[in-house]
Regions:
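N-terminal active-site segment of His-dependent metallophosphoesterases
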Residues: 24-102
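Binuclear metal-dependent phosphoesterase catalytic core
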Residues: 247-343
């Protein structure tokens, strides 16, 4: 398919997505402030969730170091808490770059050297686990996975009374249709056991039309299956789309959470110009904590700066309650506000080693951090540079933007910077 034509289709779907959630999300209500975490919230379960590690097999690869840090940083965090358990790590697919044996060797090595007693590592297969073999026999992907990880490509595990269900692609590395009946059966077992508690499901692609990235990196069979189970909290990757973005959580008939990537987070500003890497190094994973009543706390961890994001935290009480949708697309959009710069904000100008001009300015923030900035540089009435750039909201430690606008002749210029939120509020 022609790439331009595909982008047009994605843009049309994105528009339909916006209309769909603009109506559907009203069912859960709007203008509802998400609840604060109760002071007496006491976890009985703690687990980390990541995806898209894309190990190359090289020990000094940044992704390998981040996957290692996921274990060690979480153990360090748990040691400071009243509940000190670190019960599980979920890897929602694409732990390898292409499903090659040296990549699995590195995956297993990191787990063997860093995963301590009492922590389970739960894994499902992503599309990259089949890439090396697709041209002649994709089913080999299963054989290699079973050799290094587990004989079971689909799993149902109970940890501290909570159900975890992991679903891999079929052996073609592309579809889930053949997995639907198994998934339904396992969900029914989990609901029969714990009808009023969250059931954690993970697979590689997003359920279609749920979270950020689910327009063009998704699977419809997964979506239609999960719709019947309000207890489900689903974790998915594939798109690499920024997990720090509020659109990466969405409550409809079930709860969906996008996992971003331990490689590089990505963004897509309009579904026409295509996916873009976020500026600089970016990587993140979720830390989930659950109490005895089934209330869930999600906190996002920056795997590059080794710290939690200050404002990316979601407390979800009564997950199975169909009427409680604080994190629906419609509600989050309704409480969003246009980002503003600090009152004393200024733009400073510097020159890089190539002689190109760099604009430096502080981050803008509304209810959520700015997602992008629309920047125009003018010489008199003439526009000499104009672009929309992704913000650095994919990093927990950065407070200032640095935007290269190329080589400019000496003279006076007028710079206009308009920040926009993830829900396109601003200007």
């Amino acid at each position: 398919m022609n790439i331009y034509f595909r982008r047009i289709i994605n843009a049309v779907i994105a528009s339909a997505f916006t209309c769909y959630f603009g109506v559907y999300s009203l069912v859960g209500g709007v203008n509802k402030q998400p609840p604060e975490v109760p002071e007496d919230f006491t976890p009985v379960l703690r687990f980390a969730v990541c995806s898209d590690v894309h190990l190359s097999g090289e020990e000094d690869q940044a992704n390998a170091k981040r996957f290692t840090a996921l274990y060690n940083d979480t153990y360090d965090y748990a040691a400071t808490q009243s509940y000190k358990g670190f019960d599980a790590v979920i890897v929602a697919g694409d732990m390898t770059g292409g499903g090659r044996e040296p990549e699995y060797v590195m995956f297993k090595k990191i787990i063997d050297e860093n995963c301590r007693e009492g922590t389970r590592t739960l894994v499902c297969m992503g599309n990259h686990e089949f890439i090396e073999y697709r041209d002649y026999d994709a089913t080999i992907g299963y054989d290699v996975y079973k050799k290094f990880v587990s004989e079971d490509v689909d799993t149902h595990t109970v940890i501290n009374g909570y159900h975890f269900i992991g679903v891999s692609y079929a052996d073609d590395g592309k579809t889930f249709k053949s997995k639907v009946e198994w998934l339904k059966a396992e969900l029914d077992k989990a609901v029969a056991d714990t009808p009023d508690k969250p059931i954690f499901v993970f697979q590689h692609p997003h359920p279609t039309l749920t979270v950020y990235g689910s327009v063009n990196w998704s699977d419809l069979d997964i979506k239609t299956t999960l719709m019947k189970y309000p207890q489900v909290v689903d974790f998915s990757g594939h798109s690499h789309y920024a997990s720090c973005d509020p659109r990466s959580i969405n409550q409809t008939s079930f709860t969906s959470v996008g996992t971003g990537s331990l490689g590089a987070l990505m963004s897509n500003l309009d579904y026409i110009s295509g996916d873009v890497d976020m500026p600089g190094e970016t990587a993140a994973f979720w830390l989930a904590e659950v109490d005895a009543e089934g209330n869930l706390l999600l906190k996002l961890y920056d795997a590059v700066s080794h710290r939690f994001f200050d404002d990316v935290q979601y407390y979800i009480p009564n997950v199975a309650n169909k009427g409680t949708k604080y994190y629906s697309w419609g509600n989050l959009r309704s409480i969003d506000t246009a980002p503003q710069f600090p009152q004393d904000a200024k733009v400073s100008v510097s020159t890089d080693s190539e002689g190109e001009t760099v604009l430096n300015f502080p981050n803008a923030k509304g209810y959520f951090d700015a997602e992008n900035y629309r920047i125009t540089v003018k010489s008199g009435a003439k526009t000499v540079w104009s672009d929309t750039v992704v913000s650095n909201y994919g990093r927990a430690d950065l407070t200032e933007m640095a935007v290269n606008v190329g080589k400019l002749d000496k003279g006076e210029y007028t710079v206009t910077i308009a920040p926009y939120s993830p829900y396109s509020k601003g200007g």
